[in-house]
């Protein structure tokens, strides 16, 4: 299980929606942003292009619309409690002051919408995502005890991600219709994950170097054990963010005819 407290966390898929939500109350999108209409036969292709363009335009933020820089993204805390007595990995981890870097290098490869069923699907590729912050940790990895407190750096290389938003229509006073995201599914598929935990075993340099080597030599096993916790928790976060957007802006403004 993983618990996350966040200040500002947006994945590349949500950037375009975030812009719409921020400027939807009486403002127009900047001319530099691509607009997409449901009547366009190439609507999905337009949205894919719009998201990819917005990623670059918002790298340094958009102060006039109250949008913070997207590079890096900040997360307050993440707590992970993963595994059981018979699991190859049993860990209790707590991270603070987290910075997610290089998300703005993401590229949306596929983008599909079914607005009648209120489903949005996307696939993205990111050359590298770096997760850096302060950590405390104790537990067991592949039968080896592990403990430490210090700086951590976890990097996902050549990450392919799949996103599925499942919504339902809600109507508010005045007849305006909004899309409520009731489920957000995420799947991460990195080609490599590297770990660097400083100050393991109370600063024992030799043991720390050995444990980091074990983690990196067995990254697939380690990531596989932690994957569901990451995916479930980030899906929860992204659903919460999406609903803060979709429940503020009517569908006909997010997806104009």
Please tell me what each predicted stretch does.
Residues 3-4, 28, 236-257:
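C-terminal helix/juxtamembrane-tail motif
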Residues 4-25:
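Cleavable N-terminal signal peptides of Sec/SRP-targeted secreted and luminal proteins
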Residues 26-191:
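Hydrophobic-cavity lipid-handling domains and compact docking modules
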Residues 51-58, 62, 66, 215-219, ...:
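Sec/Tat-exported extracytoplasmic proteins
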Residues 72, 76, 149, 181, ...:
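Residue-level signal for alpha-helical context at structural boundaries
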Residues 139-140, 198, 240-242:
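Short, charged/polar low-complexity linear motifs in solvent-exposed/disordered segments
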Residues 170, 177-234:
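Extended amphipathic ligand-handling, pore-lining, and cofactor/metal-binding catalytic surfaces
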């Amino acid at each position: 299980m993983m618990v996350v407290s966040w200040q500002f966390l947006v994945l590349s898929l949500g950037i375009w929606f975030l812009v719409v939500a921020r400027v939807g109350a009486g403002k127009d999108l900047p001319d530099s942003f691509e607009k997409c209409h449901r009547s366009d036969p190439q609507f999905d292709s337009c949205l894919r292009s719009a998201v990819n363009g917005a990623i670059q335009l918002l790298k340094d933020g958009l102060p006039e619309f109250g949008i913070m820089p997207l590079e890096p993204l900040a997360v307050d805390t993440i707590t992970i409690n993963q595994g059981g007595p018979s699991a190859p990995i049993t860990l209790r981890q707590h991270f603070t002051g987290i910075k997610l870097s290089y998300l703005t290098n993401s590229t949306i490869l596929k983008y599909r919408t079914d607005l009648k069923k209120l489903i949005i699907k996307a696939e993205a590729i990111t050359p590298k995502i770096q997760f850096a912050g302060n950590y405390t940790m104790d537990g067991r990895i592949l039968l080896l005890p592990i403990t430490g407190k210090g700086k951590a750096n976890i990097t996902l290389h050549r990450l392919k991600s799949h996103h599925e938003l499942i919504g339902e229509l809600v109507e508010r006073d005045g007849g305006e219709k909004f899309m409520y995201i009731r489920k957000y599914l995420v799947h991460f598929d990195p080609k490599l994950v590297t770990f660097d935990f400083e100050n393991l075993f109370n600063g024992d340099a030799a043991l720390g170097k050995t444990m980091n080597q074990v983690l990196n030599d067995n990254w697939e096993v380690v990531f596989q054990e932690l994957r569901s916790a990451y995916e479930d928790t980030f899906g929860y976060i992204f659903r919460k963010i999406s609903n803060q957007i979709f429940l503020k802006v009517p569908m006909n403004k997010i997806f104009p005819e």
